[in-house]
Amino acid sequence: MSDVARVLLEREAIQRRVAELGHAITGDYEGRVPVLVSILKGGTMFLADLLRQIGGPVEVRFMAISRYANGAEPGGRVRILMDIEDDLAGRDVIVVEDIVDTGLTLSYLLANLRRRALGSLEVCALLDRANRRIVPIEIRYVGFVCPDEFVVGYGLDHNERYRNLSQILVVPSMDVLASDPDALDVYLSGGLPDQGAEATVES
């Protein structure tokens, strides 16, 4: 079972980097009140920790989006399931994401937000899986550059499980979970896996 998962990022490494991102946002938005927009559900744990590291006034909003597969359309069709109700015109908005890979969903969301006459719009992502990018996305605040592997934990899920893990784990082969959906649960019950190579910190 040693091939079920390995640690990509330990809790301590995540918290250190989140603190650095929070301090950067604090400095960049001094004298302003940014609005952090979290995308449900994956970004909630990252958002909660990030908020604690921002040393100034800040507001929070939530959105939920979904992507539906469509054979004639690469990446599928995106739909907003839960929108922001109040007017954000003139506000400084930071979209908080757990992970950005192809950029298709985020690109749709950013285009939607830009139509609201914002004062400014930036992106803060814990993980950037840039080698999967299809649509160019400018991410001002990046936690780590993520390898091209499936990851779970710290808000990231597989079939709604494992969001509550304080670490981020790599699942090298999805075939294991396809044949046994409980394989990772069984593995974790015996203790967390050994540390693997960490993701790269974005400088």
Positions of the model-derived regions?
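PRPP-associated nucleotide enzymes
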Residues: 1-203
